Amino acid sequence: MPRVSAEILDISHTGGNESPTLGELLKDFNDSGRKKYPGENAPTQHILDLAPAAETRSVPFLLSFNNLSYNVVLRRRFDFSRRKTASVKTLLDDITGEARDGEILAVLGGSGAGKSTLIDALAGRVAEDSLKGTVTLNGEKVLQSRLLKVISAYVMQDDLLFPMLTVKETLMFASEFRLPRSLPKSKKMERVETLIDQLGLRNAADTVIGDEGHRGVSGGERRRVSIGIDIIHDPILLFLDEPTSGLDSTNAFMVVQVLKRIAQSGSVVIMSIHQPSARIIGLLDRLIILSHGKSVFNGSPVSLPSFFSSFGRPIPEKENITEFALDVIRELEGSSEGTRDLVEFNEKWQQNQTARATTQSRVSLKEAIAASVSRGKLVSGSSGANPISMETVSSYANPPLAETFILAKRYIKNWIRTPELIGMRIGTVMVTGLLLATVYWRLDNTPRGAQERMGFFAFGMSTMFYCCADNIPVFIQERYIFLRETTHNAYRTSSYVISHALVSLPQLLALSIAFAATTFWTVGLSGGLESFFYYCLIIYAAFWSGSSIVTFISGLIPNVMMSYMVTIAYLSYCLLLGGFYINRDRIPLYWIWFHYISLLKYPYEAVLINEFDDPSRCFVKGVQVFDGTLLAEVSHVMKVKLLDTLSGSLGTKITESTCLRTGPDLLMQQGITQLSKWDCLWITLAWGLFFRILFYLSLLFGSKNKRT
């Protein structure tokens, strides 16, 4: 056993933010017995070898859990009665067991038995104050420590991946997120290549993941890629929630074969599984069968026949032992007594079993981890630096700037491989622009032309926001990837939000130029290049704020239909109270507050000011004052006579060429007098920044990945 500093593994909750990762920490040991790889020089990378482990293993890890209980309070929704009744549901009831390195512990049971809940409890995904009982690794409590995130991995049931990245690229990005920055890129690539072979993905290495519209890898390969992402750092503890779900028997068996090799490399593998085949049962080392949160069997699959035989329900020959067991449990659950007798029998049977004989020495956690790293676990880089205490272990492998760059690079690479989506977005905006251009073709400087300009601006600015709603399903899909990756601190939430905002800017700029170029001159807007430049800027700002509000809503409400409903409703209210349908002066006092938080108000007022702020432009001359009134249909001669009559009454000579209303007069009539066009631009940009901050907070506090 290598000598380990006593300071190495203090698993307290303290620590600095910019300190090395665990892989950089655990490097003060004798590494001479480790397998060397071609061209390997210090600093070195420890590469996981998934070949079958030797029979004698000198570094055991023992994950023990005792008397785990977890209850949730069920409150009735929309209960307006005075009686505030709440029922308590038990999800886990006094569960005890253990899992060892080199073995696969499988948790079985029917739907609602508590399989996923037990996996979550062992993986630290249940709030500490809600879970009763203890979980220890080699006798030390690590459930809520930062150490658990460093030495463990959790593979979710969903296989959501970026569809246009290849298998190799997906794993390479995972290595950039999870492996130490000090590790050379060549070593990270070597780790990825090794993992591809170990997962049996060599033939699919350069194949894109794929989705509904793009052919990609098979379901089994996709599941193995998901596992590979989470084991890129070669964790000691590996938790999987139904890794064989949705796979055929062959692919399911191949996945469990991979998990068996991972276990034999020195990992503790714990997974839930619904109904394993006979071949899969042969790969499992220990079973825990649950029924309504209670343990009805805990032991080796080999002992399952004798267990049920002793219970009085012998398993017939050539019968799948777990299928039979689950059928018996399902039958008992439907009886009046339930599984009470089986639970009590299991408790007595456990007490009568002799303790497992083992030649493995019980060692402390710090010694076990240090020796495990020396054998190649926890992929890391070594340098000649002095040993660093566990108190300085960093939660993240990269600084924020590096995380932002990696996230942006991955997003852009996936995005540029979907030219049809890029073209569709730009095409939609251009078609909308061309439609508006033909409807509002070359508007003149008449009262009708002024009114039609306002209609064009109202519809055009609202289009900017509604076009952003297509981002809702895209982000909701990405949200699950974000949750999985941030569960074990692949990157900071702030880095994700910043990169998400930055990569959207070029897209929004292209959309802004496309819309501005197709409408500015065709509609007949004034002001020349300077006015066109500002027109592009305010459209860009409108797209930015629209994209931000949509991103925030989709981060807050992870349901596509509900997000659409909230977004459309909010934008409709913004349009109603933004100043086009009703002037600010006529909005009721109890709704005036919404006028000022309307996202549409500021870009709408900005383009109006940009168009009408020139006092030399006249929009109502002489007889045009009668347009839109009952006198509009009278003869021109009569209108001139009416002007003469008005001149006498007002004491001012009004002729056919007299300007009666300029652009600023129209702005005043619309109640647009409080802000300049540049104020409107900055406020629109600030709204976008505000909603990005809310998006960050919604992810930070709403994506804890823990049961309460």
Swiss-Prot record:
Domain ABC transporter: 75-317
Transmembrane among keywords: yes
Assigned GO CC terms: membrane
Predominant location: membrane
Gene Ontology terms, MF aspect: ABC-type transporter activity; ATP binding; ATP hydrolysis activity
Protein's membrane topology: Multi-pass membrane protein
Regions crossing the membrane: 421-441, 456-476, 508-528, 537-557, 560-580, 589-609, 681-701
Signal peptide coordinates: none
Binding of ATP, residues: G109, G110, S111, G112, A113, G114, K115, S116
SMART domains referenced in this protein's UniProt entry, alphabetically: AAA (SM00382)
InterPro entries with a match to the protein in the record: AAA+_ATPase, ABC2_TM, ABC_transporter-like_ATP-bd, ABC_transporter-like_CS, ABCG_transporters, P-loop_NTPase
Database matches in Pfam families: ABC2_membrane, ABC_tran
Domain of life: Eukaryota
Subcellular compartments: Membrane
Start and end residues of each ABC transmembrane type-2 domain: 402-612
Keywords assigned by UniProt, alphabetized: ATP-binding, Membrane, Nucleotide-binding, Transmembrane, Transmembrane helix, Transport
Keyword Cell inner membrane: no
Matching PANTHER family: ABC TRANSPORTER G FAMILY MEMBER 17-RELATED, ABC TRANSPORTER G FAMILY MEMBER 28
Family affiliation: Belongs to the ABC transporter superfamily. ABCG family. Eye pigment precursor importer (TC 3.A.1.204) subfamily.
Protein name (database record): ABC transporter G family member 18
Originating organism: Arabidopsis thaliana
